[in-house]
Amino acid sequence: MNEEVEDGEVKPLELSSEDKAILVETLKNKLQALAEQHVDVLESLAPSVRKRVDVLMEIQSQHDELEVKFFEEKAALEAKYQKLYGPLYSKRSKIVSGVLEVEGETEEREEKGVPDFWLNAMKNNEILAEEIHESDEEALKYLKDIKWCRIDDPKGFKFEFFFYTNPFFKNQVLTKTYHMIDEDDEPILEKAIGTEIEWHPGYCLTQEVLTKESSESTKPITKTEECESFFNFFSPPQVPDDDAKIDENTAEELQNQMERDYDIASTLRDKIIPHAVSWFTREAVQDEDYGASWVDDEEEDDNDDEYSDEEA
């Protein structure tokens, strides 16, 4: 899969004209089929029922208009409180990094701030723990802060990962930007763009060098392969290049990768960043486990009721 690099960011390549035409035609066919199903359902109804359904559809239209206003007001409210959160996040960052001392601290302390704060906060989350490998941990100990913000042009949101100077890569900040499009008043992921990491020689965590022994008279054969790493988060799934054909299996795999990538982003944005200390102390883990257990208990009670009804 080829990628273009510009201004330190990996740019996704566009679909070929042929692939675009195929996708557009497929989408048109699906929409046409849905429209025909809609008409078929209405025409199959008795006249009196059809009139009632027409009224229900008008009610739905009124609901949809209110829903649009809801999303607009929700976005404005989120923007308002994001600004109010800012000073709190800034103070948190200063305490974690040791820039701001806490009242009552003794002078006899071995280390500043809260070591491995973000590493442990992320590792305590089930989704992110699957992405963090043992080889990543030393590099993530240099993670100083994580921030996110909404962007308007294009619409979406952006992450910034701030790092101390470290032996793994040159970048002080790694970014990941998600471009969204509105579809039926719901934001849908269009593409994601990540920073190209400038690895120091011999420290790249997203590749591994494999060595194969050859005959005694020749040197060992070495080759480089991609490997699993948290830092692959900054190289998001991309559309295949112009030379590739998007078959059904490839499209499904790409869709799964993009959904997984967005799950990670949502977890960082909605859980880790706003509640970092709760994840660090594992309090958030207990809350999630309790919530899951409560749901399971509810389902078991429902099943018991069903069996009781059947026996009765």
Swiss-Prot record:
Location in the cell: Nucleus; Cytoplasm
Chain span(s) of sequence motif Nuclear export signal: 45-60
GO MF term (any one): histone binding
Region entry Disordered, spans:
288-312
> SUPFAM superfamilies in the record, alphabetically?
NAP-like
To which protein family does this belong?
A: Belongs to the nucleosome assembly protein (NAP) family.
Q: What does this protein do?
A: May modulate chromatin structure by regulation of nucleosome assembly/disassembly.
The GO cellular component terms are:
cytoplasm; nucleus
- A Pfam family annotated for this chain is NAP
Signal peptide boundaries? none
- Print the organism lineage: Eukaryota, Viridiplantae, Streptophyta, Embryophyta, Tracheophyta
Q: Which UniProt keywords apply?
A: Chaperone, Coiled coil, Cytoplasm, Nucleus
Q: Looking at the keywords, is Chaperone present?
A: yes
Superkingdom of this protein's organism: Eukaryota
Q: Name one GO biological process term.
A: nucleosome assembly
Do you know which Gene3D superfamilies this protein is assigned to?
Answer: 1.20.5.1500, Nucleosome assembly protein
Q: What is its main location?
A: nucleus
Q: What is this protein called?
A: Nucleosome assembly protein 1-like 4
Domain text: The acidic domain is probably involved in the interaction with histones.
Q: Which residues form a coiled coil?
A: 24-78
